[in-house]
Amino acid sequence: RPDRSHAKSARSVAETMGNYHPHGDASIYDTLVRMAQPWSMRYPLVDGQGNFGSPGNDPPAAMRYCITGDALVALPEGESVRIADIVPGARPNSDNAIDLKVLDRHGNPVLADRLFHSGEHPVYTVRTVEGLRVTGTANHPLLCLVDVAGVPTLLWKLIDEIKPGDYAVIQRSAFSVDCAGFARGKPEFAPTTYTVGVPGLVRFLEAHHRDPDAQAIADELTDGRFYYAKVASVTDAGVQPVYSLRVDTADHAFITNGFVSHNTEAPLTPLAMEMLREIDEETVDFIPNYDGRVQEPTVLPSRFPNLLANGSGGIAVGMATNIPPHN
């Protein structure tokens, strides 16, 4: 519901699969993602929070991804806490209310209001040349510096997509000058804030120095917030308990062992609620679901004409039929 706190995407998919669609979670999540994309639907039915792809065919983040309990979550004032210690004794496959200030991708304090213990899953360790490391599930996204057609760009990559030689983004404020790591605003670290510290940026500027957008790209990458650490290895770390946080920002990013992590959430939009309005007031018929445990509606009340407004397409008897979206 749009008037309540956001729900983790994996939870919405799991409940849908358990109650109405026992054929796997991939098609459910793909549908959820599409309903959140304003370039896919004229009137989105899901208010996506996090990485739901882009018009340029960038893929959305995975619905469930987590990190191991030893990951240090960056807090304000240079402090940190093991993610497993945020809620001591959290039960597997549980979500737990918290009230904790953490650092976002820019190093600013933001509110984390939920800790998820996602049970035990296969995990992999990403280790950089400098010795920084983080361990998480194969579909856990980390912010990376990626060469996109010659343009150095910040993009989310899943751990199973990260290879030795890639560059992981490290948040500088997660480290102190009194320990191993990196910091901004200190003279001894100043050279790393210039182009020499951003792989591919010098080559990009040499080729595009007359492009007015080139300076903006360079400014974003060299403003001192990030260090770009070369990945040395990605190795199997067995099966371990994993955790995640819900962060109250647009991209839900938080810092773990210096790496930038994030997740996705998805409540319905107010318009989608009009499709469900008064569904519990005998407006439509209900039948048993696939296993007879709960009831499901045969149709939705649909005060909002979704088929006309958002359009649709299909094939029947060898003929394609398309309904364009209407105002």
Curated annotation (Swiss-Prot):
Its GO biological process annotations read:
DNA topological change; intein-mediated protein splicing
Q: Please name the SUPFAM superfamilies in this protein's record.
A: Hedgehog/intein (Hint) domain, Type II DNA topoisomerase
Alphabetized GO MF terms: ATP binding; DNA binding; DNA negative supercoiling activity
Record Pfam families: DNA_topoisoIV
What the entry lists under InterPro entries is as follows: Hint_dom_C (IPR003586), Hint_dom_N (IPR003587), Hint_dom_sf (IPR036844), Intein_C (IPR030934), Intein_N (IPR006141), Topo_IIA-like_dom_sf (IPR013760), Topo_IIA_A/C_ab (IPR013758), Topo_IIA_dom_A (IPR002205)
Which SMART domains did the record assign? Answer: HintC, HintN, TOP4c
- Give the family per the record: Belongs to the type II topoisomerase GyrA/ParC subunit family.
Miscellaneous note, as given in the UniProt record, is: Few gyrases are as efficient as E.coli at forming negative supercoils. Not all organisms have 2 type II topoisomerases; in organisms with a single type II topoisomerase this enzyme also has to decatenate newly replicated chromosomes.
Q: What does this protein do?
A: A type II topoisomerase that negatively supercoils closed circular double-stranded (ds) DNA in an ATP-dependent manner to modulate DNA topology and maintain chromosomes in an underwound state. Negative supercoiling favors strand separation, and DNA replication, transcription, recombination and repair, all of which involve strand separation. Also able to catalyze the interconversion of other topological isomers of dsDNA rings, including catenanes and knotted rings. Type II topoisomerases break and join 2 DNA strands simultaneously in an ATP-dependent manner.
Note the subunit structure: Heterotetramer, composed of two GyrA and two GyrB chains. In the heterotetramer, GyrA contains the active site tyrosine that forms a transient covalent intermediate with DNA, while GyrB binds cofactors and catalyzes ATP hydrolysis.
Matching entries from NCBIfam families are given as: intein_Cterm (TIGR01443), intein_Nterm (TIGR01445)
Protein name in UniProt: DNA gyrase subunit A
This chain's source organism reads: Mycobacterium xenopi
- Gene responsible for this protein: gyrA
